[in-house]
Amino acid sequence: MIIRKKDFGIFALILALALGVTACGSKNVSNTSEGTTQYKYGKIDIPGKDGALCGAPIYIAYEKGFFAEEGFDVNLISADSETRKIGLNNGTIPIVNGDFQFFPSIEEGVKVKVVDGLHNGCIKFVVPKDSPIKTVEDFKGKKIAIDEVGGTPHQVASLWLEKAGISAKPQDGDVTFLPYSDGNLELEAAKSGEVDVAALWDPLGSIAEKSGDYRVVFDLSTDPAFAGKYCCFLYASSKVLDSEPEKISSLLSAYRKAQNWIAENPKEAVAIISDKKYSAIDDKELAEKLVVSYAYPTIKERESGGSHVAEDVKYFVTELKNIGYLKTDDPDAFANQIYQKVEVK
């Protein structure tokens, strides 16, 4: 191609603009001369293999490249609640999702802060369709299947029962919690009579209900004690937050991009989660309804002041104090201590 002199300036301008756009789009990611990719913050581990549908922002941030855009080479790992606490405390895991199960651990010295809200309710308690259990009062003396002691279903059940005057403490014997490694095993145990109730992450609870073989006796998204509140928060390692606050800010940016994308594209989000086998989804239409019910906050909602993270932290601190799960004498001060607002670009 021959470039005439009078066209050279235009050509140079177009080339400069193209290079500028490329540079702006990859400010946190670059390619080395060897052809490998370099990330601003390098490789990090994030728990994201528990199979819960509500973990959608983690899966979508990974699959849509939002983590990479913010400068992270993310390795999704499996991690129970204790592994998460240890990782957060020593800084090897910078951020995790979890409910108020971490509040007592913070009081006991685990160095972690609530930095954002992730979504609304995602847990259901189901019983066989012919079970006599219908209300919380019927739970006394019963066996409840959970995924792990100290995990979210266990903590939710504990708060719900304690508010009704039924002790969830093992030494009192009002109820018995039995851990199972898989939600399907919980359902089988409930069906066989090995346990009376299965406390399940979505989508298993809703799938069980739709089968007609089980009834839902508790829904975290609609129960008066939990409805409209974040059941799951994002927790940042205090060690990382203090030494590299911009790292946590960038991680939150990735999560928020994912939340916004899911809110605007629930059907596509479910397709990705199903195709990549992050969660067991046989009924995509049901899964889509559940994803919408989690009310992932959009960027516009955040900009208009729709966030209520601090208020929800204070609510659950107060509730946990009321049932004796927190020792603090000043719930408001403790709530302010464990929540830290992070500026996100």
What are these regions (language model features)?
Residues F100-Q101, D182-K277:
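Pocket-lining segment of extracytoplasmic ligand-binding domains
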Residues I2-F11:
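Bacterial N-terminal signal peptides that target proteins for export
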Residues V313-K345:
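Conserved C-terminal helix/tail region of periplasmic/extracytoplasmic solute-binding proteins
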Residues G25-K27:
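Bacterial signal peptide processing site
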Residues G48, L118-V127, Y214-L241, S293-Y294, ...:
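Periplasmic-binding protein-like
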Residues D242-Y325:
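Secondary-structure end/capping motifs
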Residues N31-D182, A189, D196-D202, D213-F218:
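Short, glycine-/small- and polar/acidic-enriched structural segments
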